[in-house]
Amino acid sequence: MEEEKRLGDRNDARRIRSVDGMHAYMTHLMPHRTDAEVYINETLDVTELLKFLETRNTPEAPFKTTIFHCVVMAAAKIVKMRPLLNRYVSGNHYYMRDRISLGFTIKRQFADGAGESLMMLYPEDSFTLRDFSRMIVGEVSEARADEAHGADGALENLKHLPRPLMNVVMGAIRLMDRWGWWPESLKRLDPNYSSVMLSNLGSIQCNAIYHHLNNIGTNGIVLTIGVAHK
């Protein structure tokens, strides 16, 4: 039976109350999210993966499975196996998320001037690669067909606000973000609150880059995937 939320918990996470002194001190030593960034670059051999995808993506397959789908599944499985990766720091406190989430941005069309859409995925523990592919393909198709998909409609409305009013709105958002008052219904649409945020740069023939965190939200892991080389 799932434990009930206590005072100090959040709508998407539970506060960790057994933090050691060193880690409690670090939240004050590095008060901003971008103070604590660490970068790493890894090269993976995908030879066998490409062979597997070639056998999976037959003409009869209902949808195409890609390297990106495999990386998304791997990220979810790693967080499941290493649950400490699903923690975040906000308001100088540590929290453990209630579930694993994956966020990314998609291009509506493969063109320089094409619009973009925010995407959030909430996989189940039992998901297979086929489940991940089906979910990603379905969500992407829906987002490309609906310009008001997810948080996109709200963002389109916000962009029309006068700059002084926008500053007031952003100040209120940052305050609610810090104290855990940001509605869970909005967090579910925003990759800035995901366990892992991904960027598939290989789709535009670009190598992987070092990507910064954003100074809002609770996302602490950003994963970029570059183009596959021989």
Which residues does each PLM region occupy?
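C-terminal catalytic/motor cores of large multi-domain enzyme assemblies
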Residues: M1-K230
